[in-house]
């Protein structure tokens, strides 16, 4: 299970260093193989390959009225491998789609990660906090 937020920088080649606390898990779970794809909220999804295979199967099984979503998730997917330094190369097309420039946020979301442009994430988080808790969390005890 992946959790936590990490402020990271992309290098000049568009590579992102996976934090050391997640590298070992990605090596054990997926031998360093991950898949990146677009997310409709404007970020990227980063899956360990076994989790991606499960997600891909679920997306492929969607009915025809969701065909564009199949294109978005599956048609933009990029399989990559962590290099020896624990970096993942984010393709230029995916960097552009998520408006990733230099500063990014990597968010552990349980079975996968989200990769956000840092400024976009900060603005969306602030907006969500200003709107207050959604109904689904009203009775949630902390």
From Swiss-Prot:
Its main location: cytoplasm. Coiled coil: none annotated. GO terms for biological process: negative regulation of DNA-templated transcription initiation. Keywords: Cytoplasm, DNA-binding, Repeat, Transcription, Transcription regulation. Belongs to the MraZ family. NCBIfam families: division/cell wall cluster transcriptional repressor MraZ (TIGR00242). This is Transcriptional regulator MraZ.
